[in-house]
Swiss-Prot record:
Catalyzed chemical reaction(s): L-histidine = trans-urocanate + NH4(+)
Organism taxonomic ancestry: Bacteria, Pseudomonadati, Pseudomonadota, Gammaproteobacteria, Moraxellales
Gene Ontology terms, MF aspect: histidine ammonia-lyase activity
Pathway this chain belongs to: Amino-acid degradation; L-histidine degradation into L-glutamate; N-formimidoyl-L-glutamate from L-histidine: step 1/3
Protein name: Histidine ammonia-lyase
Gene name of this polypeptide: hutH
Protein species of origin: Psychrobacter sp. (strain PRwf-1)
Length: 519
């Protein structure tokens, strides 16, 4: 069934909030009326270029190394059809619905700017897929992030043509039947249209946007869980003093320190050891959270800035312009997704570091020499009970896995198309791997949440702060106190899902009002 959420799409005006809406749930998209004038004018330019009887790449020539091959006018439609079917060579699991919706919405936003030469019926066809929640089957693997995301976008286009398979409400069916069920007509491509549909960075950008959304949620949740760990370990709040962080001046550091001050304020546990505590300084994993998590917040913001520009960009090739002497098709390289690859690699660093520091706090909480008087491995009768001993090993394993995954994908390149396309971005993989990294980090932070919550419960007779009590209560709604050894894997999964839900962030949202600079 069509969604009741609506999105009025104005070219070059997409926001991160709108993109999050598209990722999270089906939408009804409409295109601003002003766009159709530019769309029609651009298509008229293509018709004029064809009428000149001169070669124009991608319009009446072959592709890649075959660009010098001239195609006769009566085969221009076949040229575009053959382009799509020959380039539909993806492999692997299909992309999830939210990612595919992002791809289609950003492709509409690009084509609707009137520099790609397609007819309005092509754009309306994509809007029809979006509005009937028809999800093309797009395999996850097969793009190197230049020349555009050719293979995955070809699979998207197959559905528009009534070929291949797609999904409605999670059920796989033929694209032909899905279009008929929705009352939509398959599109027959005209000159330039196939290339316009598949040349672009929308897949890489959608995958990286998914990683960006996950990173935003994780940096927020890791902050509240990290504050819970500080209190559980009887740590100090003095390292969060505003004067320290103002002297350095980094936005993220200042904001995370402010959050820690507010999250811990009023804790009876903190008040219980303000005096007669011979510990001079806490370990870095407690004390340096503003410096580390704040730096993660800053680079998440940098990535968001890049992705917002890219989501509103025209990344087709060639592009259609009108000069004083008439229309021209200019070949360039906007399809090269290097900015997206850099954004993805930046997000990978943030996601890995959030998990890495969280793992260190788990290690601290189970270590009786560091945890402020908590029992070894956070359990009564240690020895008979192993407590959180091996839960920490899981956190360590995932943190180390993320360190390998965080290696920058953008430094890799491999030539393709007989060396015509001799430098590529690897942005598609760079963005895709962020999901697995985020799942790992969510599990690590979930284990820390279990450990910190356990530590809070051992401070009998003392309450943590009001804000942290709310976070602790959310945990205890899902997972009970660990009084003796039990099957722990389901508890870890429950805590992970609580982290991914971002529910722990809802009760202190006003403290994050200035965190994300693109909002």
């Amino acid at each position: 069934m069509p969604s009741t959420q609506t999105l009025r799409l104005i070219p070059r005006k997409l926001t991160l909030a709108q993109l999050r809406q598209v990722y999270d749930s089906p939408v009804q998209v409409s295109l601003d009326d002003s766009a159709y004038k530019d769309i029609d004018a651009s298509h008229d330019c293509v018709k004029e270029i064809i009428a000149r009887d001169k070669s124009a790449y991608g319009i009446n020539t072959g592709f890649g190394l075959l660009a010098k091959t001239r195609i006769s006018d009566d085969q221009l439609g076949l040229l575009q059809y053959n382009l799509i079917v020959s380039h539909s060579v993806g492999t692997g699991e299909r992309l999830e619905d939210g990612v595919v919706r992002l791809i289609m919405v950003m492709k509409v936003a690009s084509l609707a700017q009137g520099f790609s030469g397609v007819r309005r019926k092509v754009i309306d066809g994509l809007i029809g897929l979006i509005n009937h929640d028809i999800i093309p089957h797009i395999p996850a693997k097969g793009s190197v992030g230049a020349s555009g995301d050719l293979a995955p976008l070809s699979h998207m286009t197959l559905t528009l043509l009534g070929q291949g398979t797609c999904y409605i409400n999670g059920q796989e069916m033929s694209a032909k039947d899905a279009l008929a069920q929705a009352g939509l007509e398959p599109v027959t491509l005209a000159a330039k249209e196939g290339l316009a549909l598949i040349n672009g960075t929308q897949v890489s950008t959608a995958l990286t946007l998914r990683g960006y959304f996950l990173a935003r949620d994780l940096v927020s949740t890791a902050t509240v869980v990290g504050a819970l760990s500080v209190d559980a370990a009887r740590g100090s709040d003095s390292p969060f003093d505003a004067r320290i962080h103002e002297l350095r001046g980094h936005h993220g550091q200042i904001q995370v320190a402010k959050a820690h001050r507010r999250l811990i304020a009023g804790s009876e546990i903190r008040a219980s050891h303000t005096e007669n505590d011979d510990r001079v300084q806490d370990p870095y994993c407690l004390r340096c959270q503003p410096q580390v998590v704040g730096a993660c917040l800053d680079i998440i913001n940098q990535a968001g800035h890049t992705l917002l520009i890219e989501a509103n960009a025209v990344t087709d090739n060639p592009l259609i312009f009108r000069d004083e002497d008439g229309p021209v098709a200019i070949s360039g390289g906007n399809f090269h997704a290097e900015p997206v690859a850099f954004a993805a690699d930046t997000l990978a660093l943030a996601i890995a570091e959030i998990g890495s520091m969280s793992e260190r706090r788990v290690a601290l909480l189970i270590d009786a020499t560091l945890n402020g008087g908590l029992p070894p491995f956070l359990v009564d009768n240690p020895g008979v009970n192993s407590g959180f001993m091996i839960a920490h090993v899981t956190a360590a394993a995932l943190a180390s896995e993320n360190k390998s995954l965080a290696h920058p994908a953008s430094v890799d390149s491999i030539p393709t198309s007989a060396n015509q396309e001799d430098h590529v971005s690897m942005a598609t993989f760079a963005g895709r791997r962020l999901y697995d990294m985020a799942q790992n980090t969510a599990t690590i932070v979930g284990i820390e949440l279990l450990a910190a919550g356990q530590g809070i419960d051992f401070h009998k007779g003392l309450q943590t702060s009001e804000l942290l009590t709310k976070a602790h209560a959310l945990l205890r709604e899902k997972v009970s106190f660990y009084d003796k050894d039990r099957y722990l894997a389901p508890d870890i999964e429950a805590a992970k899902q609580l982290v991914l839900s971002a529910a722990l962030n809802e009760h202190w949202s006003e403290l994050r009002a200035d965190w994300f600079l693109q909002d």
